Structures are given as structure tokens and as C-alpha cells.
């Protein structure tokens, strides 16, 4: 029982350590924020298209 506090302290120290990406960056790596921005712009574009067509999407926008 005397080593339980030491174990808890070590567990807390290792869990709160900074997370480091172990992989080396390459020129093809894209930051996650770029993916989020692309997803937001795609969703915005799709919402704009559905807004101009209304609730029924039987024909593309601008075509009757």
C-alpha cells in the first residue's frame, strides 16, 4: 500500500506529458486545420445549392 501514492503520481505525470508527433513531417503533410477549412467550405457550398432548390432536390439548381 505504500507504493500506491507513488504509482498514482507517476501515472499522473505520464498522462499529462506533452504529446509529440513521432512521425517526421514530409512535404505532403497537410495541417488538420486545412482539412477542416475544406470541409467547412464544402458543406457551405452544398447548403447553398440546397437552399436555392428548396426542400425537394429533384433537379439541379438553375434547371427546371
UniProtKB/Swiss-Prot annotation:
Main location: secreted
Keyword RNA-binding: no
Propeptide regions on this chain: 23-49
Alphabetical list of Pfam families matching this protein: Chi-conotoxin
Modifications made to the protein after synthesis: Contains 2 disulfide bonds.
Expression sites by tissue: Expressed by the venom duct.
The keyword NADP is annotated on this UniProt entry: no
Cellular compartments annotated: Secreted
Signal sequence, renumbered to the chain: 1-22
MF terms in GO: ion channel regulator activity; toxin activity
Keywords: Disulfide bond, Hydroxylation, Ion channel impairing toxin, Secreted, Signal, Toxin
A GO-annotated cellular component: extracellular region
Entry-annotated residues carrying 4-hydroxyproline: 60
Family from the record: Belongs to the conotoxin T superfamily.
Record remark on domains: The cysteine framework is I (CC-C-C). Alpha4/2 pattern.
Role summary: Probable toxin that inhibits ion channels.
Protein name (database record): Conotoxin Am1.1
Native source species: Conus amadis
Taxonomic classification: Eukaryota, Metazoa, Spiralia, Lophotrochozoa, Mollusca
Amino acid at each position: 500500500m505504500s507504493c500506491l501514492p507513488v504509482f498514482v503520481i507517476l501515472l499522473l505525470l505520464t498522462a499529462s506529458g506533452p504529446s509529440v508527433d513521432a512521425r517526421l513531417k514530409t512535404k505532403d503533410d497537410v495541417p488538420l486545420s486545412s482539412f477542416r477549412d475544406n470541409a467547412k467550405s464544402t458543406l457551405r457550398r452544398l447548403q447553398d445549392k440546397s437552399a436555392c432548390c428548396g426542400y425537394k432536390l429533384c433537379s439541379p439548381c438553375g434547371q427546371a
